[in-house]
Structure formats: C-alpha cells, structure tokens
Amino acid sequence: MLSSIQSFLRRFTAHPLLPKVVPIRTLKAKHRPLVLHHLLQLSDADRFLRFGYLANDAQITRYVEKLDFTRDEVFGVFNRRLQLIAMAHLGYGATPQADAEFGVSVLKSARGLGLGARLFARAGMHARNRNVKTMCIHALTQNSAMLKIAINAGARVVYYGTEAEAYLQLPAPAMDTRLAQRLEQRFADADYFLKKQWLRANGSR
C-alpha cells in the first residue's frame, strides 16, 4: 500500500495543473484541538494581526469552539511530525454564493515558505468551485504580508485608516478547477498517511 501511495505522490507532483504543490488538508471537527493548539502558539503580535485585536487564550478558545466545520471550510498544513504549522479559515456569509471571508495564520517556524499564499490559492479554488463571487479579507494595514498576497492575486484593496478590506472577484468554476481540488485533497490525504506511518515506524506516535 505504501508503494502505491508513493507512486501516486510522484505522479501527482508532476501534474501540470498543480505545480510546486504543498499538501493542504481540509480539516474537520475532529481537528478542533489541533486548531486550538496552533492558534495558542501565536505570539501577541501575530494574534493581533490574525484577529485584528490582541486576542487572549480565552478569546481564541471561544473562536475555535464556534468554528462551523460543516458550513465553513478550514484548511491546514502539517509538518512531518503532524504538527499544524499553518491554517486558514474560509467563512461563508449568510448567502454562501455571494462572498466568503478568508483568514490565515502561519507559525513563525514556517514563515518564508509561501504557505500563506498557498492557503489563499487553495481557499480561492474551493470558493470558486462553490460559485462564490467574491473572496474578502479584512486586515490591519500593518499586515503587509496578507495584503501583499491579496494584491498579487488581483484583489482590490480599500483602506480605512488603520484597517483595510481586500476583495477578490472569482471567475466561474471550470472542469480543471474541480479536478485540481479533488487531486489536491487526494495528495494531501496520501501525504498525511505517509507522515503518520513514518511517525509510527520511528516510535514518535
């Protein structure tokens, strides 16, 4: 089984639709403790940028408890020790096809790898495949990294003093985006399985 999964990963990483793939998993309610642990590791400065205010542990806990994994979509990147090093939350509005709001966090140890941009692209593809018209980002103006990701993706940014809103218009879904979404999920699941097997073999879990 391992050899077949490894063969799939080699073929997948060479797929023309998905260059330089980062394995991004769709997270479920069972991953809630991992999401909480990830967010609690953020420094005060990172919490301020992620939430727009200096969220304490209790506020972060309430945020995680209220995450609706059925309505919204939560994505995560795991390192080889299955630690959640980056995650994104794509929250859908009252009218799901109208808009969706994106938020992301990356641990300091995983910065500079382009994970924020990868998560943004993944969320955009999922939103597009659900016929969402606009993906929105609410950020502080000092969150230059997040705003740069949005601008590079073609978003329109409106500034309001110390805050900013970015709006990315999404095209209609297409056959290749739906295929890419399925392939990415299969790749991420296979990658996670191999990491889990590696940990078991090395007595880490």
Q: What are the roles of these predicted feature ranges?
A:
Residues 1-22, 138-205:
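Terminal substrate-recognition subdomain of acyl/acetyltransferases
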Residues 22-34:
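A short beta-loop-alpha structural element at the N-terminal edge
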Residues 28, 43-44, 68:
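Residues that cap or delimit alpha-helices
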Residues 37-52:
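Helix-loop element at the rim of GNAT/NAT acetyltransferase active sites that forms part
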Residues 52-98, 107:
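Acetyl-CoA-dependent GNAT
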Residues 78, 103-112, 140:
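A short, internal acetyl-CoA/4′-phosphopantetheine-binding micro-motif in the GNAT/acyltransferase core
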Residues 83-85, 130, 149:
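Structured alpha-helical
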Residues 106, 112-127, 134-136, 148-152:
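Conserved acetyl-CoA-binding loop-helix of GNAT-fold acetyltransferases
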